[in-house]
Swiss-Prot record:
Organism encoding this protein: Mus musculus (Mouse)
Binding site for Zn(2+): 83, 88, 165, 170
Coiled-coil stretches noted in the UniProt entry, renumbered to this chain: none
Keywords, ordered alphabetically: Metal-binding, Zinc
Function per UniProt: May regulate the activity of kinases.
GO molecular function: metal ion binding
Record's keyword annotation contains Ribosomal protein: no
Pfam family for this entry, one: Mob1_phocein
Highest taxon of source: Eukaryota
Name of protein: MOB kinase activator 3A
Family: Belongs to the MOB1/phocein family.
Keyword Metal-binding: yes
Length: 217
């Protein structure tokens, strides 16, 4: 295992959240396999994100949200030792963008936090969302709530902020590990998906607009 990024990923001393998995034999498991097969076959990412004919949009979106959470959580985990209260006292994306945390429990008003604190709260919050059967039902035949896409938009908008922080403040670490290609591919996959289905407000995409125009067009 010569790739330093992979060494970080499989370092047993690192603690990553367990993956949300799909039960074999379910429709979502089959969709997940199909999506992974498209990526492994080197299919154009723009085509890979498109809804397969005859499939349900909510199922397709649910599969990808869980996958993006797992991947982005992993990417942040590999650079987290360099993202500290001292190095990143404010969760930001350069001097122009500051992200404040708000939830329905402890932080009812937007609150400025350090990047590592923000990330911990974010990953915990998303994990709760995707394991909530009322939002991401796993039983065959259980319908998605009418608010599903609204909930997904909030999750994906917040996940995008992880990319913003990592690219702007920790890209040197990504480069040092030789993992630019991996992270860039993950970003392009994410970008094509959220724009294909209009799942993020274009204003949220502004911090990486220049990089995206070079990478994805």
């Amino acid at each position: 295992m010569s790739n330093p990024f992979l060494k970080q990923v499989f370092n047993k001393d690192k603690t990553f959240r367990p993956k949300r998995k799909f039960e074999p034999g379910t429709q979502r498991f089959e969709l997940h396999k199909r999506a992974q097969a498209s990526l492994n076959a080197g299919l154009d990412l723009r085509l890979a994100v498109q809804l397969p004919p005859g499939e349900d949009l909510n199922d397709w979106v649910a599969v990808h949200v869980v996958d993006f959470f797992n991947r982005i959580n992993l990417i942040y985990g590999t650079i987290s030792d360099g993202c500290t209260e001292q190095s990143c006292p404010v969760m930001s994306g350069g001097p122009k963008y500051e992200y404040r945390w708000q939830d329905e429990q402890r932080f009812r008003k937007p609150t400025a936090l350090s990047a590592p604190r923000y990330m911990d709260l974010l990953m915990d919050w998303i994990e709760v969302q995707i394991n909530n059967e009322d939002i991401f039902p796993t039983n065959v035949g259980t319908p998605f709530p009418k608010t599903f896409l609204q909930a997904v938009r909030k999750i994906l908008s917040r996940l995008f902020r992880v990319f913003v922080h990592v690219y702007i403040h920790h890209f040197d670490r990504i480069a040092q590990m030789g993992s630019e290609a991996h992270v860039n591919t993950c970003y392009k996959h994410f970008y094509y998906f959220v724009t294909e289905f209009n799942l993020i407000d274009p204003k949220e995409l502004e911090p990486l607009k220049e990089m995206t125009s070079r990478m994805c067009h």
